[in-house]
C-alpha cells in the first residue's frame, strides 16, 4: 500500500515538474507575482475592477504589436527591433486619413488602407536589407528603427499637412507632437460590444471590440502559418539548409515575413491609438519595439520559435505587471512615484527578457 502511494506521489511530482518546465519557471514566478498584486490591490485601497479594466485595456492596445513579432521569428530573421518602420507606416496612414477629411469609423478603415502601401514598401526595403546581412539582423534592425524615427522627426515638420486639428497653430504647418482622435477613430474598436458594468456600481469595462479584432488577426496569423507558404517560412527559420534543399527560396520567405511583420506593426499602432485616444509622433515610436520584444519573450518565445499562445501570455503578463506594480506600491507607501516604478519594472522586464536564449525551459 505504501509502495503504491509513493508511486502515485512520484507520478504526481513528475507531472508537476513537467508542467512547470513546460510553462517555464520564470513565467510561473511572474504570473504568481501578478496574481499576488491582484489579490493585494483591494487591501491597499486600489479598486480591483478598475485594475482589471486597465490591464485589459493595455492588453488590447499592445497585443497586435506583439503579434507582429511572430512572422520574423518564424522565418529566422529574429526579433523585430525594426518595428518602428511599421509604426511609422501606421502613423502616416492615421495622419493622412485625418488630412483627407475622413471621420468616425471610416477614418480608422482608411488609415489601415493608406498605411498598407507604406508598410509594403518600407517592409520590402527592410526585408531586402536583412537578406543582405544574415546573422546580424537584430542589431541592424535596431539601427533601422532608430534612424527611421529620426528621419521622420524632420519629415513631420516638412510634409504639407494643413488640417487645423493636426498642425501647429502659430505657424499653420508642421504636425503637433500629440494629436487628439476625438471625432475621428477614438475608441472605434473598444466601444464595439463593450461590456460596461459601471451602471451596476462596478468600475469594469471590457473593450470587447478590440479583443475580437486581435483574436481575428491572431487566428489569421495561425491559419497563415499552417498554409504552404507559412510552413515553408517556418522551415526556413528552423532549418535553412533543409529548406534550401527542398527548393524553398530562403530570401523570398524572409522577405514575406518582414513585410507581414511591418504591416502588422502598422495596424497595431492604429489599434493602440484608438484605445489611447491620441496620435503621438516624432520620437514616440523610438522604443516601442522593446516592450513588444520583451512581452513575446516573457510569453515563452525564443529568437527562432514563437506561437500565438506566447503572444497572449506574454502580453498579459508584461502589461499586467506594468499596470499593477506602480498602482499597488503607490497605494501602499502613499507616495506618487508611479512613473518611476513603471520605468523600473518595464525596463527590468525588458532586460530579463533580452537575456533569455531559450523558450519555456529557461
Predicted segments — roles?
Residues 1-37, 238-245, 249-252, 314, ...:
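Cytosolic-side transmembrane-helix boundaries in multi-pass membrane proteins
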Residues 29-41, 69, 146-153, 210-222, ...:
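Hydrophobic core segments of alpha-helical transmembrane domains in multi-pass membrane transport
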Residues 50-100, 120, 124-135, 296-305, ...:
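Single transmembrane alpha-helix segments in multi-pass membrane proteins
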Residues 86-90, 141-147, 308-321:
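Central hydrophobic cores of alpha-helical transmembrane segments
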Residues 103-149, 318:
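Alpha-helical transmembrane segments within multi-pass membrane transporters and channels
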Residues 148-225, 334-338:
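Transmembrane helix-bundle core of multi-pass membrane transporters
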Residues 201-280:
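Helix-loop-helix "hairpin" substructures at the membrane interface of multi-pass membrane proteins
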Residues 259-343:
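Transmembrane alpha-helical segments in multi-pass inner-membrane proteins
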Amino acid at each position: 500500500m505504501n509502495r503504491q502511494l509513493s508511486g502515485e506521489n512520484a507520478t504526481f511530482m513528475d507531472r508537476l515538474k513537467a508542467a512547470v518546465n513546460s510553462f517555464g519557471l520564470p513565467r510561473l514566478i511572474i504570473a504568481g507575482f501578478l496574481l499576488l498584486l491582484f489579490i493585494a490591490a483591494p487591501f491597499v485601497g486600489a479598486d480591483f475592477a478598475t485594475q482589471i479594466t486597465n490591464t485589459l485595456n493595455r492588453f488590447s492596445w499592445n497585443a497586435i504589436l506583439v503579434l507582429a513579432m511572430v512572422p520574423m521569428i518564424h522565418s529566422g530573421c529574429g526579433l523585430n527591433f525594426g518595428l518602428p518602420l511599421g509604426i511609422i507606416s501606421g502613423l502616416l496612414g492615421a495622419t493622412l486619413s485625418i488630412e483627407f477629411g475622413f471621420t468616425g469609423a471610416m477614418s480608422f478603415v482608411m488609415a489601415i488602407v493608406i498605411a498598407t502601401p507604406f508598410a509594403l514598401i518600407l517592409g520590402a526595403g527592410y526585408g531586402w536589407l536583412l537578406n543582405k546581412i544574415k546573422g546580424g539582423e537584430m542589431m541592424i534592425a535596431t539601427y533601422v528603427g532608430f534612424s527611421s524615427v529620426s528621419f521622420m522627426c524632420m519629415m513631420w515638420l516638412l510634409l504639407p499637412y494643413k488640417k487645423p486639428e493636426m498642425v501647429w497653430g502659430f505657424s499653420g504647418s508642421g504636425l503637433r507632437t500629440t494629436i487628439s482622435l476625438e471625432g475621428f477613430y477614438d475608441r472605434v474598436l473598444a466601444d464595439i460590444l463593450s461590456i460596461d458594468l459601471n451602471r451596476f456600481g462596478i468600475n469594469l469595462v471590457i473593450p470587447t471590440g478590440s479583443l475580437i479584432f486581435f483574436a481575428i488577426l491572431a487566428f489569421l496569423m495561425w491559419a497563415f502559418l499552417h498554409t504552404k507558404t507559412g510552413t515553408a517560412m517556418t522551415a526556413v527559420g528552423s532549418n535553412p539548409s533543409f529548406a534550401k534543399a527542398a527548393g524553398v527560396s530562403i530570401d523570398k520567405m524572409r522577405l514575406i515575413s518582414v513585410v507581414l511583420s511591418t504591416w502588422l506593426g502598422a495596424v497595431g499602432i492604429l489599434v493602440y491609438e484608438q484605445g489611447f485616444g491620441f496620435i503621438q509622433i516624432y520620437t514616440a515610436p523610438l522604443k516601442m519595439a522593446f516592450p513588444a520584444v520583451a512581452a513575446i519573450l516573457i510569453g515563452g518565445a525564443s529568437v527562432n520559435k514563437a506561437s500565438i499562445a506566447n503572444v497572449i501570455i506574454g502580453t498579459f503578463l508584461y502589461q499586467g505587471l506594468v499596470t499593477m506594480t506602480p498602482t499597488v506600491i503607490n497605494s501602499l507607501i502613499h507616495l506618487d512615484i508611479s512613473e518611476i516604478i513603471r520605468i523600473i519594472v518595464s525596463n527590468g522586464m525588458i532586460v530579463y527578457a533580452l537575456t533569455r536564449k531559450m523558450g519555456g525551459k529557461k
